[in-house]
Structure formats: structure tokens, C-alpha cells
UniProtKB/Swiss-Prot annotation:
PANTHER family: SSRA-BINDING PROTEIN (PTHR30308:SF2), TMRNA-BINDING COMPONENT OF TRANS-TRANSLATION TAGGING COMPLEX (PTHR30308). Belongs to the SmpB family. One of its GO terms (molecular function) is RNA binding. GO terms for biological process: trans-translation. The lineage of its organism: Bacteria, Pseudomonadati, Pseudomonadota, Alphaproteobacteria, Sphingomonadales. It is found in: Cytoplasm. The keyword rRNA-binding does not apply. Keywords: Cytoplasm, RNA-binding. It holds the Pfam family SmpB. This is SsrA-binding protein. One of its GO terms (cellular component) is cytosol. NCBIfam families: PRK05422.1, smpB. The gene is smpB. CDD domains: SmpB. Required for rescue of stalled ribosomes mediated by trans-translation. Binds to transfer-messenger RNA (tmRNA), required for stable association of tmRNA with ribosomes. tmRNA and SmpB together mimic tRNA shape, replacing the anticodon stem-loop with SmpB. tmRNA is encoded by the ssrA gene; the 2 termini fold to resemble tRNA(Ala) and it encodes a 'tag peptide', a short internal open reading frame. During trans-translation Ala-aminoacylated tmRNA acts like a tRNA, entering the A-site of stalled ribosomes, displacing the stalled mRNA.
Amino acid sequence: MARPKPETFDKQKTVAENRRARFDYAVEDKFEAGIALQGTEVKALRAGEASIAESYAEVRDGEAWLINANIPEYSHGNRLNHQPRRPRKLLLHNREIERLLGAVERKGMTLVPLSIYFNSRGRAKVELALAKGRQAQDKREYIKDRDWKRDKARIMRDKG
């Protein structure tokens, strides 16, 4: 008889989120990629310690890499602890890597990590966005639209 799933893995658990990326970039497409991590990195992520605010992804030699993501050293780690800002390999299919590479080279887009989370099976994943940078004018328009939607929702809520 199959063993029931533990309750901790019923849904995904977000570890780090890059909220600024949604403001600075216009997100065109999203991808889910696995990350090749060392043991102490997984333990540090499970402890909820990570920052992807200044990180980005790039394709080098047919492989995708997460650059400048900060996963601090594990507090109970020994001399074999990991480097906090080392490049981490992203696990994607070759078709996905070729598609990302084509978009980045031809259309001038950027690969931005939106979040790091554990999926229902307990595997660490990165949500990558294929995005285009916003100019200052675009950001102002985005803020106006967001404020109008918020005001509209407030008006509808107060009337009903």
C-alpha cells in the first residue's frame, strides 16, 4: 500500500522572491527550471535564507546558469560549506535552452529569476522569466495602471 504524502509537500513553498523584477521588466514568458545544488545549499534554502534580487540567468556553452544568486552559508555547515554567490547550473531541456538563447540574442531580452521554491516533490525550482527591460516612461505608465485598478476595485467594493 502506498504511503501517504507528508503534509509539508502538499503545495509549493516559496523560499525567495524577486518582486522588483516584475516592476523593472515586462515579463513575456515564464519557465520552470531545476537547480543543481550542493547539500548545504539545500539546507540553507529550506531554512528560508536566499536572495535573488540582483541575480540573472545566462546561457553559456549550451548550458543555462543562475548568476549572482545569494544563498548564504548553512549555519550548521562545516568546512565543506558552499560559496554563497557561486554560479549555479539550471536544469532545462535542450529545446528550452535553444529557445531562450534565441530570444536573448535576437530580441534583446533578459532572463530574470522571479522566485525560488520547493515543488510538491520537495525539489528546488527556479521560476525564470523571459523579459524585456522597462524604460522610465513605461514604469510610470505601469504605476498609473496599477493605481487605477486598485482605485477601481476600491470604488466597486464600497458601492456594493
